[in-house]
């Protein structure tokens, strides 16, 4: 078994001799700042507990069973050459390490940013809800203040009805007054016409009588009769005196 693993490693090194030199400096470059930065290393117990917590399962037994099964499958795959450790495994491990670091260190930052955005949106929604509630309360207060509008409307309707009735009566009186004035005007004109007709008739009658008298006075017989009648009247007056 060991000879097979050795042959596989040698073959992989011959096929890809340039991968390991490129990967190892990268690993050394990544590892050197870690040890030279002076950051205190994490407690192994805490690290182990975080690894156990990251495993799927609801209790310690299930997580242990999953971890044991994964280790057994890995050993079985490596021992039967179902999977061979090569430079691709190193690259995959590096990628997984990078992604794990991003998730571990960037996750809290992203969670903080997401929480801030969520709080911001919640504050906006709460403010909008409060404004809407206040607007509704204000509207309800305005409507309550207008609760007496029905009585006022009824009173105004009664007043308008009475006003319409008075206007109708005033219009009727105005029409009657206008009709009476027109009738008076017609009657006055008729009276004036009759007066003018009577005056004309009287004038014509007087002219006719005067003309007739003047015509009779031109007759000598009539003048003689008038003179005799006048003398007789004078004698009667003298005899009575």
Swiss-Prot record:
Transit peptide start-stop: 1-35
The keyword Transferase is assigned to this record: no
InterPro entries: ATP_synth_Bsub_B/MI25, ATP_synth_F0_suB
GO CC terms in record: mitochondrial inner membrane; proton-transporting ATP synthase complex
One GO MF term: proton-transporting ATPase activity, rotational mechanism
Key words, A-Z: CF(0), Hydrogen ion transport, Ion transport, Membrane, Mitochondrion, Mitochondrion inner membrane, Transit peptide, Transport
Major site of localization recorded for this protein: mitochondrion
Top-level division of the source organism's lineage: Eukaryota
Cellular compartments annotated: Mitochondrion; Mitochondrion inner membrane
One Pfam family matching this protein: Mt_ATP-synt_B
Protein family according to the UniProt entry: Belongs to the eukaryotic ATPase B chain family.
Role description: Mitochondrial membrane ATP synthase (F(1)F(0) ATP synthase or Complex V) produces ATP from ADP in the presence of a proton gradient across the membrane which is generated by electron transport complexes of the respiratory chain. F-type ATPases consist of two structural domains, F(1) - containing the extramembraneous catalytic core, and F(0) - containing the membrane proton channel, linked together by a central stalk and a peripheral stalk. During catalysis, ATP synthesis in the catalytic domain of F(1) is coupled via a rotary mechanism of the central stalk subunits to proton translocation.
Protein's UniProt name: ATP synthase subunit 4, mitochondrial
Organism: Neurospora crassa (strain ATCC 24698 / 74-OR23-1A / CBS 708.71 / DSM 1257 / FGSC 987)
Gene: atp-3
């Amino acid at each position: 078994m060991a000879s097979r693993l050795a042959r596989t490693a040698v073959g992989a090194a011959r096929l890809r001799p340039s991968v390991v030199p490129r990967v190892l400096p990268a690993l050394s470059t990544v590892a050197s700042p870690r040890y030279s930065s002076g950051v205190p290393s994490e407690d192994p117990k805490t690290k182990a507990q975080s690894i156990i917590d990251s495993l799927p399962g609801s209790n310690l037994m299930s997580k242990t069973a999953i971890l044991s099964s994964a280790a057994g499958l890995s050993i079985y795959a490596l021992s039967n050459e179902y999977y061979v450790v090569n430079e691709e495994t190193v690259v995959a491990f590096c990628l997984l390490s990078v992604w794990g670091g991003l998730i571990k260190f960037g996750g809290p930052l992203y969670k903080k940013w997401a929480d801030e955005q969520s709080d911001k949106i919640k504050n906006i929604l709460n403010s909008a809800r409060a404004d809407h509630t206040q607007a509704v309360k204000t509207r309800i207060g305005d409507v309550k203040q207008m609760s007496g509008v029905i009585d006022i409307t009824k009173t105004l309707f009664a007043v308008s009805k009475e006003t319409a009735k008075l206007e109708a009566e005033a219009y009727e009186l105005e029409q009657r007054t206008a009709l009476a004035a027109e009738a008076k005007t017609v009657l006055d004109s008729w009276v004036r016409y009759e007066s003018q007709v009577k005056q004309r008739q009287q004038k014509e009658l007087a002219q006719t009588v005067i003309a007739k008298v003047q015509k009779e006075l031109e007759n000598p017989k009539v003048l003689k009769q008038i003179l005799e009648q006048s003398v007789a009247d004078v004698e009667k007056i003298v005899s009575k005196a």
